[in-house]
A protein has these predicted regions:
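Short loop/turn motifs that connect adjacent beta-strands in outer-membrane beta-barrel proteins
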Residues: 1, 12-14, 71-77, 120, ...
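Surface-exposed, low-complexity loop segments enriched in small/polar and acidic residues
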Residues: 1-63, 67, 76-78, 83-104, ...
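Transmembrane beta-strands of outer-membrane beta-barrel pores
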Residues: 3-11, 83-91, 129-133, 153-155, ...
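Extracytoplasmic gating/loop element in the C-terminal half of outer-membrane beta-barrel translocons
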Residues: 31, 424-514, 518
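Solvent-exposed loop/turn elements at secondary-structure boundaries
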Residues: 92, 160-231, 235, 248-250, ...
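Outer-membrane beta-barrel signature, preferentially recognizing the C-terminal barrel domain
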Residues: 102, 153, 199-250, 279-303, ...
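C-terminal beta-signal and terminal closure region of outer-membrane beta-barrel proteins
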Residues: 281-289, 332-359, 453, 458-464, ...
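Conserved small-residue
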Residues: 282, 299-398, 456-458
């Protein structure tokens, strides 16, 4: 059994006093009588109460766990079940709304049954039966089972010692399971089965000519008792391979597929003729993702003085929408279904306008005023107008589809060295022209803008920066291929070099180590303007590069 309670509250109050001041209005020097008048007529002559701040967090957690293990002969069985109850209030200073002042409650039971025979064959069943306050009726609780199996081929009798000296481990594994998610729509997305009505948000018109408006009640969210758990169905097939004695070289590869259903999102295709004041949401999305991940580890001691360990990992993952309640676009390229979740759409930029004659004979661009030296976009659908209907999917997703890392640690006698590289690939980002545009908010011009921008004396229609202006040119800050960049990079994330000083008896010191370390030392990327991990704003705070020199003493 395990139970915990944690509470923290903060309340502040202030009292104020404003004295009353009087001035002499009349005074009789013979009788000594006088009259006064109030110089501060709006002052309250007693202590006033001024509301202060209020905040508080409370969490109560209870857990009951039962474990049972039994081994007889070549059979091993393990059982485990856990029940939890979690209640928490996290106001975050939002004391005026029930979504922050009412406790959040979750109740659940999970368990696992595992069996193995002779350390060769393995089977496992696990489940989660979870309840959430966000849903109602038969949707409040969800049951999410999973199954798994494994076979260590290298433990079979036919895997002789000669083969085991070369391949010390060969294991195959497969899993299938479902996972539920109720963390949808944030804190104010609680109680989907209740409507949220606010006062003073509406404008109701009265009179024969509707000349008068009055505030009143309006819907901020509509009740939807059909909202339920997002469910993810996961498939995994993997292999583990150990080579040489004690698995000196170990390779793990896992292939996975994930199908997410009932994704909570806006119903964009809901008819406007329904007359709703707010957007409608529901469990209407479906996304599939697949890929593989691999890791490679190596460790070896060559002798007492020389040792080496190395590690590398690689992940490749793609996804796409299978279902999404989106607008009924006429053109297929505007639809999200079939595209990655983090895919972006933009305009195809041809070049910069040469002159006014070209502008007059080109499709009209609906992004504000533009002139020679501004970006010219392609009219994709050929209707004579460039607008949101001409956006096309471009580039890679904004989340990398490939992530990898590799590093090494080694030592020779008293010296040691370690480093680790980190990188990603198949990722795109857009330069944010509104964030780096010169002359706006007293902003200086980045070097690339000063060196390569369109001007009357430098009318390059392929210059990096379009026509300069002291204001933001709306036409030129549209998300387009003009600003699209490939964001792949590899970075030396950490580096450490050390030297261990042997035992010093006079100082009663067992050993000491002096070291130098660095973080984010350099990166390699096709994008050269700034660190690609910063994204589109090259004037933002850069990635920190750190250097450390240290001394470790052990007595």
């Amino acid at each position: 059994l395990k139970a915990s309670a944690n509470t923290w509250n903060y309340t502040s109050g202030m009292r104020s006093y404003s004295p009353v001041y009087y001035g002499l209005e009349q005074y009789d020097v013979f009788t000594g009588e006088y009259s006064l008048y109030n110089l501060t007529p709006n002052t309250v002559p007693y202590l006033g109460d001024v509301t202060g701040g209020r905040d508080g967090n409370t969490q109560i957690y209870f857990e009951a766990r039962l474990n049972w293990d039994k081994t007889w002969g070549k059979h091993t069985v393990s059982l485990m079940t856990v029940g939890i109850r979690d209640e928490k209030i996290l106001t975050n200073g939002q004391g005026g709304t029930i979504y922050y002042t009412l406790p959040e409650r979750n109740l659940g039971n999970s368990g696992r049954f595992s069996y193995d025979f002779d350390k060769r064959y393995f089977a496992e069943f696990a489940y989660g039966y979870n309840g959430s306050e966000k849903f109602i009726g038969d949707k409040q609780f969800g049951f999410f089972p999973s199954f798994g199996g494994g076979w260590i081929t290298s433990n079979e009798a036919f895997w002789g010692d000669g083969l085991k000296n070369i391949i010390s481990l060969l294991k195959f594994k497969v899993t299938y399971g479902k996972v539920g998610n109720d963390a949808i729509a944030g804190r104010e997305g609680r109680f989907f089965y209740l409507s949220r009505i606010v006062d003073g948000g509406g404008e109701y018109q009265w009179g024969k000519i509707f000349s008068g408006t009055y505030s009143g009640f309006t819907f901020d969210r509509y009740a939807n008792p059909d909202i339920s758990w997002e469910v993810s169905t996961k498939y995994n097939l993997g292999v583990e391979l150990g080579i040489f004695k004690d698995e000196a070289l170990k390779l793990q590869v896992d292939f996975f597929k994930d199908l997410r259903e009932n994704i909570y999102m806006e119903r964009e295709n809901f008819p406007q003729t329904a007359g709703f004041q707010r957007s409608i949401h529901g469990n209407v999305g479906k996304v599939t993702s697949k890929g593989f991940e691999a890791s490679l580890d190596y460790k070896h001691s060559f002798n007492r003085d020389l040792w080496l360990t190395a590690r590398a990992n690689f992940t490749y993952s793609t996804n796409k929408f299978l279902e999404k309640d989106e607008k009924n676009f006429r053109d297929e390229y505007l639809k999200s279904v079939g595209q990655p979740v983090n895919q972006t759409w933009g305009y195809l930029a041809e070049r910069l306008f040469v002159d006014q004659l070209e502008i007059d004979n080109s499709p009209r661009q609906e992004f504000g005023q533009y002139m020679r030296g501004d970006i010219k976009y392609l009219d994709v659908n050929g209707d004579g107008v460039v607008n949101t209907n001409d956006r096309v999917p471009m580039g890679y997703p904004t989340v990398p589809e490939i992530q990898y890392g590799f590093g090494l640690s080694g030592g020779y006698k008293n010296f040691d060295l370690s480093f680790f590289f980190q990188g990603n690939a198949r990722v795109s980002f857009y330069i944010a022209p509104e964030a780096i545009a010169p002359f706006i908010n007293r902003r200086n011009a980045p070097e690339i803008v000063a060196r390569d921008s369109w001007s009357e004396t430098h009318p390059d229609v392929h210059a990096f920066w379009p026509r300069l202006a002291t204001y933001q040119v709306s036409n030129n800050v549209q998300q387009s291929s003009w600003w699209l960049r490939e964001g792949s990079f590899v970075r030396l994330k950490t580096l450490e070099l050390g030297y261990t000083i042997p035992k010093v008896d006079r100082l009663k010191m067992s050993n000491a180590r002096i070291y130098f370390s660095g973080e984010n030392l350099f990166s390699i990327s096709a994008f050269k303007l700034w660190d690609p991990e910063m994204g589109g704003n090259g004037l933002a705070y850069p990635i920190n590069r750190r250097f450390n020199i240290g001394l470790q003493l052990n007595f």
